[in-house]
Amino acid sequence: NTYRMRISTLINEAIKVGMSSNSMEGIKSKRTKANLHKPYKNIGLIIDNVRAYNANLHLCALITYGCLLRPHREVRELTWGDFSDDLSYIHLSGNRNKSGRNRIVPVPSYIKDFLVKGNPKDNIFSGKPQPLNQDYFKTLWSRFKRQSNLLEQGQTLYSFRHSGAIEIFKRTGSITKLQKAMGHSSINVSLTYLRGLE
């Protein structure tokens, strides 16, 4: 699908400058399979290992777990301007998250310890206005996974979000509080995060 998207972009540009037809028309996207993200049982140990491996991956994992943001876009694209002045909250506009609604997310103190506020327009990982490339954390996670002996089959960077969701449900016992914290439009979506609950 990624190659199809890139080729389509090139063909669309070629059509703008005079190409007469779109050879990508009629080619369907490959359907992707849903992925089960297995939650972590030993979250502290995994987080410590990630911290020793790479500071950016560690911060991404912490924010994914503690703030329940999606790692590959919502976390990767964070700027210092998305944080409140005291770093206690993250403000995400609707065009920056999957639900399409504005979200205000509390930042736990154990995450604030790793944050040093920078220029409001700068990305928290790159230190520049541009975020890191969209495969940055995917690639970093693959490299970490290869050298780690702690991870189980099905545990991904996204598993930190699932583990955080389970932790919230254990603490509150409320599916509606979990739904609100996750930014889901439906309780049914939030329930899928609890399938790893034991």
Regions found by a protein language model. Name each.
Residues 76-116:
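Conserved tyrosine-mediated DNA breakage-rejoining catalytic core shared by Y-recombinases
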Residues 22, 26-72, 76:
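Basic, Lys/Arg- and aromatic-enriched nucleic-acid-binding interface segment
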Residues 96, 112, 182-198:
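Catalytic-site neighborhood detector that most strongly recognizes the C-terminal catalytic loop/helix
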Residues 16, 62, 66, 73, ...:
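C-terminal catalytic core of tyrosine-transesterase DNA break-rejoin enzymes
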Residues 108-152:
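Active-site/catalytic core of tyrosine-dependent DNA strand-transfer enzymes
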